[in-house]
Amino acid sequence: MRPRLPTFVGLALLALLDVGVARAESAIYALDADHTYATFAIDHNGASVNRARFDEVAGSVRFDPVAKAGAVDLYVQVASVYSGSKGFDEHLLSPDLFDAARFPTLRFVSERLVFDGGRLVEVPGQLTLLGRTHPVTLKARQFRCYPNQRAKTEACGGDFEAVIDRTQWGMNYLVDKGMPRNVRITATIEAFRQ
């Protein structure tokens, strides 16, 4: 079994909201660990793209589809990073990058969801990484709620992404040697209505 990743976000988390199924009250959604993780990608010397994921994402999502309101509070365990390369994973966890010994979790918090008509488009929030907190807006690439037969309740999920400048959080490794500052983060989320 591979470790579980988000991202970043991540991330993200988020708006497990059903714009199609109207309910008058705010509901809590529990994350589905089998379908929730975060990934990141960064250019590697213009030759390839390094990718990895965090598989351990926990937290809560609250959503009111009628009011088009909600909140997200997600925690990512940094040690759950998985790139497919043991050596690269160890470097990602080192003080050069995520410094997992000092900063074992990432956190994304959002107090609002942005809709365009009935469609969820953004989840603006705050990302805490390496002990620093800065705003990040996750863009909804897809989002849907549906009746989940296995869980016997409504499930909502989607893919959300953002591009961040890692140096805002003090992750400066090799920037002075030409490595990019920008990192694409994606949060894949599914959650069950409680």
For the regions a protein language model found, what residue spans apply to each?
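Low-complexity, acidic/polar, glycine-enriched regions of mature
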Residues: 23-194
